[in-house]
From Swiss-Prot:
One BP term from GO: translation
Gene3D superfamilies, sorted: Ribosomal protein S11
Alphabetized HAMAP family for the sequence: Ribosomal_uS11 (MF_01310)
Role summary: Located on the platform of the 30S subunit, it bridges several disparate RNA helices of the 16S rRNA. Forms part of the Shine-Dalgarno cleft in the 70S ribosome.
Gene name as annotated: rpsK
Protein name: Small ribosomal subunit protein uS11
A UniProt-annotated Pfam family: Ribosomal_S11
Subunit structure: Part of the 30S ribosomal subunit. Interacts with proteins S7 and S18. Binds to IF-3.
Gene Ontology cellular-component annotations: ribonucleoprotein complex; ribosome
Native organism: Methylibium petroleiphilum (strain ATCC BAA-1232 / LMG 22953 / PM1)
Length: 133
């Protein structure tokens, strides 16, 4: 006889609540989207959210408000994991840089430091052509 097929309910992993008080918020702010990932000090992801994942599509993804909403969602999920203090690392030139940090601070999470880790080329690849609007 054949075995009974595995159902999806048997394979679902239960989220384990980690008690981590300090973490790092990685804000990737591109021109098209903003992604916020909150990790512990070792780099293990605790929570993440993006402005596209919050229901914003197209050009609305690249707004400061969309980044604020995504930061609030990621921040609440990180608080559920026990996060109280965050170091913020911002990467990219997008419009969601500042509003995402403000949203994390408004949740009551203590911002320890803010650093810009945007990669800057030492005369590497040729940049894209200038936009003419």
């Amino acid at each position: 006889m054949a075995k009974a097929p595995n159902t999806a309910a048997q394979r679902v992993r239960k989220k384990v609540r980690k008690n981590v008080s300090d973490g790092v918020a990685h804000v990737h702010a591109s021109f098209n989207n903003t992604i916020i990932t909150i990790t512990d000090r070792q780099g293990n992801a605790l929570a993440w959210a993006s402005s596209g994942g919050q229901g914003f599509k197209g050009s609305r993804k690249s707004t400061p408000f969309a980044a604020q909403v995504a930061a609030e969602v990621a921040g609440r999920a990180a608080q559920d994991q026990g996060i109280k203090n965050l170091e913020v690392e911002i990467k990219g030139p997008g419009p969601g840089r500042e509003s995402s940090v403000r949203a994390l601070a408004a949740l009551g999470i203590r911002i320890v430091s803010i650093s810009d880790v945007t990669p800057v080329p030492h005369n590497g690849c040729r940049p894209q052509k200038r936009r003419r609007i």
